Amino acid sequence: MAAFLCAKMEGCGIELDVHLLKDGNLAVMHDSSLLRITGADVNIEDLTTEELSNYHLLDTDQTIPAFSDVLQALGGKVPLIVELKCVRNNYAELCRATCQMLDGYAGSYCVESFDPRCVYWLRKNRPDIIRGQLTVNYFLSENAKLSWFMKFALTHQILNFLTQPDFVAYRYGERKTVSNLICKYLWRAQRVSWTLKNREEYDIAVQEGWIPIFENFQP
């Protein structure tokens, strides 16, 4: 929560990840596993809100915040990019719960996901919400447990004809691909670049027409 409040104070937009808990509530965290950030070998989707409150971030007094608490703390003062983290085919419930929560947020926001099912759900059920397709080169990703066909389809954004995203978000180092050029000139989709680590990357991305997502520096 401290990082979100700092971004609010600096007037920076925020990109955050949302997970669906066992009790149907939402929490904000990057990984599904709590191991890297708390040392506990448990997945966030297997916990209730009450159980999650027992885990602290590394050696701090900070806990993993509920999505509702983050929205209340920000008070609509900064724009949000909300990434949906789908696990075990929970995409419909995750999408529905997130959209219902965002309906009460006074600021501007958009929603994105690596999972095209989430993007398609938004297109069919909440076309009023700006939606984005996140992707990487899945052939270079060690964590991608997918078939060759799915790696090809997701890397080259073939499913965009179904999901029709308003923007595509691609890893900065992999942004110069044929599929991104197709998205720019054929689909006319806005492009977003993540995650920029320094001012040089930030300036290059902006000059090339990408909306920047950055961390660990102030542009």
Can you describe what each PLM-predicted range is?
Residues 1-219:
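Phosphate-group recognition and catalysis centered on beta-loop-alpha active-site segments
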